[in-house]
């Protein structure tokens, strides 16, 4: 446990932020024992907090980042670096982009520094069988070693799975599950755990909404299901919720509504993989649960960032008075 005891979080965050303003792509090479310490300490914190987080607004919610470190820095510049704002990230920190290590290290460092104000959910890429293939394993092996990748795996296996904001907004990476009847089922999932090939945990990280599906449908991903608008409406009604907030799919404007604004998809990696001309978005939830969207245009476009008008959820949602 020496790695944890000697961890200088402020120094690590400072070095990770030093590349602000540099040409995108410049690496920050932390010491291996520092990264190991980040994994071990954050793992402790994840396990000390619920697998189904109960959070309070105001906070900012972000979708997939996928190793696009300089876009993550732009998100923080736009939304406010912690602790100026509270954050909830919906998973998929690693793979595909060029700087998964910087991305996950900064996020874990902020989790350690501000454990009650900064929250990270698990995405389907925080899973050994996926990030072994899509880039994170290769990045760890090239810049450090395979043992460090395995340390990250142990950390990812302890991430929380879902969050509920002020008893009204249900957040997860993928979507709903035909197995999900009670929130208690999520709370009963034991950590550490890998992501199974099917079932509740798999679906929460993998499923997608589909406007052409009635009920539950098959998916092109070959994992989990798609679900229609009626499934969303029934779920919200049953659990007295107002909105599902999820990530997992590239959307052109960085956010996209579904099922009469009862579900929103967030994607926070602009110009994803350099192949899509998508914007990235972050959803700000204020104390009254009014939601607005902050948009990151692809960096190459050199257009100013735009703020979309405030969007009420299904009319105006009033924040529950604290008992």
From Swiss-Prot:
One GO MF term attached to the UniProt entry: metal ion binding
Residue numbers of Phosphothreonine PTMs: 307, 311
Function: Protein phosphatase that associates with over 200 regulatory proteins to form highly specific holoenzymes which dephosphorylate hundreds of biological targets. Protein phosphatase 1 (PP1) is essential for cell division, and participates in the regulation of glycogen metabolism, muscle contractility and protein synthesis. Dephosphorylates RPS6KB1. Involved in regulation of ionic conductances and long-term synaptic plasticity. May play an important role in dephosphorylating substrates such as the postsynaptic density-associated Ca(2+)/calmodulin dependent protein kinase II.
Cofactor(s) it depends on: Mn(2+)
Regulation of its function: Inactivated by binding to URI1.
Mod. after translation: Phosphorylated by NEK2.
Protein name, entry field: Serine/threonine-protein phosphatase PP1-gamma catalytic subunit
EC number: 3.1.3.16
The species this protein was found in: Canis lupus familiaris
């Amino acid at each position: 446990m020496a790695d944890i005891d000697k961890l200088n979080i402020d120094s690590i965050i400072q070095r990770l932020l030093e590349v602000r303003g540099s040409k995108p792509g410049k690496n920050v090479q932390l010491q291996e024992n520092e990264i190991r310490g980040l994994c071990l300490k954050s793992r402790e914190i994840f396990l000390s907090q619920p697998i189904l987080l109960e959070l309070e607004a105001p906070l900012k919610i972000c979708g997939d980042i996928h190793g696009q470190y300089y876009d993550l820095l732009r998100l923080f510049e736009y939304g406010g670096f912690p602790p100026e704002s509270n954050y909830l990230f919906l998973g998929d920190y690693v793979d595909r982009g060029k700087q998964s290590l910087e991305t996950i290290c900064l996020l874990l460092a902020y989790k350690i520094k501000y454990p009650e104000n900064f929250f990270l959910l698990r995405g389907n890429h925080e899973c050994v069988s996926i990030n072994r293939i899509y880039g994170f394993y290769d990045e760890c092996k090239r810049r450090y070693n395979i043992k460090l990748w395995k340390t990250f795996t142990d950390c990812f296996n302890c991430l929380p799975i879902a969050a509920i904001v002020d008893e009204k907004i249900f957040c997860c990476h993928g979507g709903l599950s035909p197995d999900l009847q009670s929130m208690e089922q999520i709370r009963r999932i034991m950590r550490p755990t890998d992501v199974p090939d099917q079932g509740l945990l798999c679906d929460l990280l993998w499923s997608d909404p589909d406007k052409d599906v009635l009920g539950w449908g098959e998916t092109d991903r070959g994992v989990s299901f798609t679900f229609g608008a009626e499934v969303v409406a029934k779920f919200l009604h049953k659990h007295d919720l107002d909105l599902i907030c999820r990530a997992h799919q590239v959307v052109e404007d960085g956010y996209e509504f579904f099922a009469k604004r009862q579900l929103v998809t967030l994607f926070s990696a602009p110009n994803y993989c350099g192949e899509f001309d998508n914007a990235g978005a972050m959803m700000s939830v204020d104390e009254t649960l009014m939601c607005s969207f902050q948009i990151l245009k692809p960096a190459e476009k050199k257009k100013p960032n735009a703020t979309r008008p405030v969007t009420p959820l299904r009319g105006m949602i009033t924040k529950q008075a604290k008992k």
